[in-house]
């Protein structure tokens, strides 16, 4: 989100800057907590989605702009404060994303064997401060969630290790972990019905084509009434998703008819059950460990409202993964909207406010903005992030124009002031040239194994490479 916003800001400034009295040139300093850039694209996309990761190439072109200066390995609130930024910059934009799981909130959620999707994603994507080993001892696994992250988690738990290594940038520790994975049965539980799922068509097509995996879907879940079908048809993406699900259901029936086989008719040693209208109500445990999950059947009306039926089923599982949403990060000195899970901003326009709501007397804080998931919460994909960026940039330019008229701009105009401040604290930022050194090393390591990349996961190794 930060890179998109930087690119759009410079483009819009060239187009509108003269008319706004701002000129057409600007310097943007982009701060990143991690030693390398690209956030969600590098550390939030499933490793078997390399096509999406090609977005990083487009982002690199933006970072190669001489008007954008990258400062990786710099932590806001620790290495530099809000007041210090406001002293040096005319505007500060938060694009801090979301890295924490929303709590599961079910009885048994604290049992050994219950995992949030965010931590699992950190492991398989090689997040610099993430786990290096992951317990994959469970033979029967449950995944809770009706969106793309749940689908990613389920797919990675069912994926063959050699297949994953061949087509991705996973590091050795992830390959060895997946290779030792004992999961043979997976249950994906989705609270609402077929027409209310939030899967992309791409995710669905990847689900159906897992080598060695038999897909099993309850045909009763596809008995949709006319109102539901009509409602689903109003939205193009929903209609396409539902059509794809019906196609997958037919394919799953063929798998069952042919015995234990995958989509190509080859022997399947793993089973992947998809349960719609199934709301988990309790994680069952013995001696502090997961032994099962209790699920209540639900009914979903055409307008998406869910009702409970009072009918329960229990499934034996030894691990439960929940992908029910992320919680955007807080930022020191910035109010947080707990209800909507994002940084407090005025009516969704990206202008940071003093408190979360107008009822609390929220006032806009000059020169402070939020974009992406930090602004709107953990919803929407890259297209939404681009739309956000344009909205926020438009507001920023309008505000900067007014600020310039009133003389309300940063006091310290020296572009090297931030470098001196960080140096005085012993902070050694990694710039774009440093990132390119890390990237070159990853490409070289990947080439040794016939892959495009092999990801570096040790932050100290990243720093050594970048500063060499």
Please identify what each model-predicted range represents.
Residues 12, 58-114, 273, 281-294:
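Feature captures the FAD/FMN-dependent oxidoreductase FAD-binding
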Residues 101-180, 342-358:
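Glycine-rich dinucleotide-binding loop and its adjacent helix/turn
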Residues 113-131, 283, 289, 301-376:
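FAD-site-proximal beta/loop scaffold in flavoenzymes
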Residues 353-468:
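C-terminal, flexible cofactor-proximal segment of oxidoreductases
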Residues 88-97, 142-144, 315-325:
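Short hydrophobic core segments
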Residues 25-27, 35-91, 248-266:
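N-terminal Rossmann-like dinucleotide/flavin-binding domain of flavoprotein oxidoreductases
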Residues 84-91, 136-138, 307-318:
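Core beta-strand elements of the Rossmann-like FAD/NAD(P) dinucleotide-binding domain
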Residues 16-33, 37, 41-43, 151, ...:
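Dinucleotide-binding/catalytic capping subdomain of oxidoreductase cores
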